[in-house]
């Protein structure tokens, strides 16, 4: 746990290591739904949907994105996944409403450590990004730019109630995520961005949670001397459903058999006592 905390603190101050020559700041609202369905002991399905506003919180939409994929559970703590991500967004270097489509393949491994009052979740993701080329502020070009991107995320979920992580209770949530670009078309911004989030998680039911708080993002743009600060209100609905059949049928059947056996034993004992009483009354 100590190395994770050190890393968490280290990357929180990472932006100070960069020379911020031209910095722009924006304020947005991020809304999202993250769902995960588990079909069996090893297989599941993941689906995400996100909407982000433009600058100053309410000036239109800057991005709509969705992600789907298959999930394989190695065990209850480790899982791997792969799938497809699509985004339609207004490029950050342009102010006019030209939307740039992005098609991305992704592969991920995630693992968790659960304690009575603290859950730590970590993940590492590899992405293959195809983004539509842009000619100018109002027109897309032909073809796509391509690059790889890696993402490492560490999240701390701290229960605040007497019975943490139960329905109608709050937990504090903190996470950091580091993004790195690489590929032939990456010249200046190998470091892509850092995201830091602080907020709360409200457990609605055992399957549903509402996560809300403040998100800060520091990003280096494709032009090497340009940086971007993002301040966002982030509100996500999280839904996890386990569709595996519970082991209640066998337990109930065993209970029924045991109950029937006990009932039969009581009946036999009653019959024996009746016969014995009749014999004693007749011959004694």
Predicted regions and their residues:
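Residues that define the transmembrane beta-barrel architecture of outer-membrane proteins
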Residues: 25-29, 62-64, 101-105, 144-152, ...
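Residues on the lipid-exposed face of transmembrane beta-strands in outer-membrane beta-barrel proteins
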Residues: 33-37, 68-72, 107-111, 152-162, ...
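Start-of-domain marker
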Residues: 21-83, 87-90
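Transmembrane beta-strands of outer-membrane beta-barrel proteins
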Residues: 45-47, 78-82, 118-124, 150, ...
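Outer-membrane beta-barrel "beta-signal"
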Residues: 109, 229-283
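Short loop/turn motifs that connect adjacent beta-strands in outer-membrane beta-barrel proteins
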Residues: 41-42, 77, 114-121, 160-170, ...
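Outer-membrane beta-barrel transmembrane domain signature
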Residues: 125-209, 218
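Transmembrane beta-strands of outer-membrane beta-barrel pores
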Residues: 49-55, 84-90, 113-115, 126-130, ...
